[in-house]
UniProtKB/Swiss-Prot annotation:
This is ATP-dependent lipid A-core flippase. In MsbA the ATP-binding domain (NBD) and the transmembrane domain (TMD) are fused. Belongs to the ABC transporter superfamily. Lipid exporter (TC 3.A.1.106) family. The chain crosses the membrane at residues 27-48, 63-85, 144-168, 170-188, 244-266, 283-302. InterPro entries: AAA+_ATPase, ABC1_TM_dom, ABC1_TM_sf, ABC_transporter-like_ATP-bd, ABC_transporter-like_CS, ABC_transpr_lipidA, P-loop_NTPase, Type_1_exporter. The lineage of its organism: Bacteria, Pseudomonadati, Pseudomonadota, Gammaproteobacteria, Vibrionales. Its EC number is 7.5.2.6. Pfam families: ABC_membrane, ABC_tran. It comes from Vibrio cholerae serotype O1 (strain ATCC 39315 / El Tor Inaba N16961). It is an enzyme of class 7 (translocase). Homodimer.
Length: 582
């Protein structure tokens, strides 16, 4: 999926401006300060004319006496304006980057699951960190240079034409050449900047995979594989950086050479008798110094072009992400609490990019308060059915109804409030156990309710032995807990939510036999007044289900109660024999 926008720099900057203008007070102050800074530099050069024409040649002139104080005052103004401009623009850029990161983060949270199926976590992290930091460069350092150097160029040009328009006319020829050179390198910088973003995404992704899979790397001796992988993407990033440096290193001397030709032309014209007769030493010195002074802002503008283009390329990528469609939430129906009756009617679903349907014409019902179990081989489509219940994906055809209303008619937040999910892939947050159990509902539950849920899930057995009990911080994804402990915290979270419909996707898969029996007792008690969809690998956990559905290659091939399915001696009976070694 391409995340780059096809917008021009101007269109991109207009979109970026919607963020910048929110902090226009700081922008106005910094712009005024930059103009004052540039004016101070220009005025100092202009002092050369009276110094040469009047100061040294006129013994009675007071100019030499006041000149040191003028220079001191100008330097003070220059320093103060420099501080004000840098501070204010840094304040503006910091806020702009913060707002863009917030919006991007919020956008990610509302993206459909299929988006994360296709994008690497490391690449997306790079967008939030590296790309947004490039925007800071465009909105602070680049803008500082553009405004300050732009004001300097305007001031110096004005000074030159004011003192000698004849000598200054040479710039009319030089200016288009400089503009063409800057435009050419800008396009090159922009292309390289996009490649750098992609390369940085690969670096982040490679590092993230190694860090998350560190135990696998150690277990299988994969250090050399990961080292080579990371070396490759790191070298790619280095190559792109060197391309940028090369382009910038070539651009700077080219601009300097063009400016040198302009100086050559000025010196040549000054030797012409008709022009020389009208020049005073002070006038010539001011014009020559101003033209020489143009080299610094021209070089700075060329250098900052690369930074500005990196910022614009990053903006295009970020805006491209923000333009991606979020989860469709067109439903209008809301229910305070549903009864929990679920009807799956002729559902067919195919994952994006796949040709074969994951589910084909699946139909079944779960009456209120009943339990239906899904069994079958891995990849048969069991978890897909659960994902369709909560609209992590939408069906291709058919419908899934909750209390007689199509799940697509519900508002997403309202729909998902009626489901509690315990997955085989437990995710916990770097927070306290209590906050993980009451996730996204802090303040809605009392401490006693949280503790009761933990006891029902048999989690208090290990929580009470932890340093701060329920207030113990468990690390990223619960790294300080065992697999079974993490599973019990997730079950406690589902118990506390008290949703009408429970989805247990291999909910006890990480538990030992003793813990599983204890948890199963708690789940049995919980399921009395709930509609439950159980996805099970261990057949012993679903023997009491009201109906068992055997799923194979996206189709339901058998259905019935445990004893009936065993009597049929079909696929379920075969699974049972394999699992129990019969």
């Amino acid at each position: 999926m391409s995340l780059h926008s096809d917008e021009s720099n101007w269109q991109t900057f207009k979109r970026l401006w919607t963020y910048i203008r929110l902090y226009k007070a700081g922008l106005v102050v910094s712009t005024i300060a930059l103009v004052i800074n540039a004016a101070a530099d220009t005025y100092m050069i202009s002092l050369l004319k009276p110094l040469l024409d009047e100061g040294f040649g006129n013994a009675e002139s007071n100019f030499l006496r006041i000149l040191p104080f003028m220079i001191l005052g100008l330097m003070f103004v220059r320093g103060l304006s420099g501080f004000a401009s840098s501070y204010c623009l840094s304040w503006v850029s910091g806020n702009v980057v913060m707002q863009m990161r917030r919006r991007l983060f919020n956008h990610f949270m509302h993206m459909p699951v299929r988006f994360f199926d296709q994008e690497s976590t490391g690449g997306l992290l790079s967008r939030i960190t590296y790309d947004s930091e490039q925007v800071a460069g465009a909105t602070s350092r680049a803008l500082v240079s553009i405004v300050r150097e732009g004001a300097s160029i305007i001031g110096l040009l004005t000074l030159m034409f004011w003192n000698s328009w004849q000598l200054s006319l040479v710039l009319i020829v030089v200016a288009p050449v400089v503009a063409f050179a800057i435009s050419f390198v800008s396009k090159r910088f922009r292309k390289i900047s996009r490649n750098m973003q992609t390369a940085m995404g690969h670096v982040t992704s490679s590092a993230e995979q190694m860090l998350k899979g560190h135990k696998v790397v150690l277990s299988y001796g994969g250090q050399e594989v990961e080292r080579k992988r990371f070396d490759k993407v790191s070298n790619s990033m280095r190559q792109q950086t060197m391309k940028l440096v090369s382009a910038q290193s070539i651009a700077d001397p080219v601009i300097q050479m063009i400016a040198s030709l302009a100086l050559f032309a000025v010196l040549f014209l000054a030797s012409v008798d008709s022009i020389r007769a009208e020049l005073t030493p002070g006038t010539f010195t001011v014009v020559f110094s101003a033209m020489f002074g143009l080299m610094r802002p021209l070089k700075a503008l060329t250098s900052v072009t690369s930074e500005f283009q990196r910022g614009m390329a990053a903006c295009q990528t970020l805006f491209g992400l923000m333009d991606l469609e979020t989860e469709r939430d067109n439903g209008k129906y809301e229910a305070e609490r549903v009864n929990g009756e679920v009807d799956v009617k002729d559902v067919t679903f195919t994952y994006q990019g796949k040709e074969k349907p994951a589910l084909s014409h699946v139909s079944f019902s779960i009456p209120q308060g009943k339990t239906v179990a899904l069994v079958g081989r891995s990849g048969s489509g069991k978890s897909t059915i659960a994902n369709l219940f909560t609209r992590f994906y939408d069906v291709d055809s058919g419908s899934i109804c909750l209390d007689g209303h199509d799940v697509r008619d519900y508002k997403l937040t309202n729909l998902r409030r009626h489901f509690a999910l315990v997955s085989q892939n437990v995710h916990l947050f770097n927070d306290t156990i209590a906050n993980n159990i009451a996730y996204a509902a802090e303040g809605e539950y009392t401490r006693e309710q949280i503790e009761q849920a933990a006891r029902q899930a048999h989690a208090m057995e290990f929580i009470e032995n932890m340093p701060q009990g329920l207030d113990t911080v468990i690390g990223e994804n619960g790294t300080s807990l065992s697999g079974g402990q993490r599973q019990r915290v997730a079950i406690a979270r589902a118990l506390l939510r008290d949703a009408p419909v429970l989805i247990l996707d291999e909910a006890t898969s990480a538990l030992d036999t003793e813990s599983e029996r204890a948890i199963q007792a708690a789940l049995d008690e919980l399921q009395k007044n709930k509609t439950v969809l159980v996805i099970a690998h261990r057949l012993s956990t679903i023997e009491q289900a009201d109906e068992i559905l055997v799923v194979d290659e996206g189709e339901i091939i058998e259905r019935g109660r445990h004893a009936d399915l065993l009597a049929q001696d079909g696929a379920y009976a075969q699974l049972h024999r394999i699992q129990f070694g019969e």
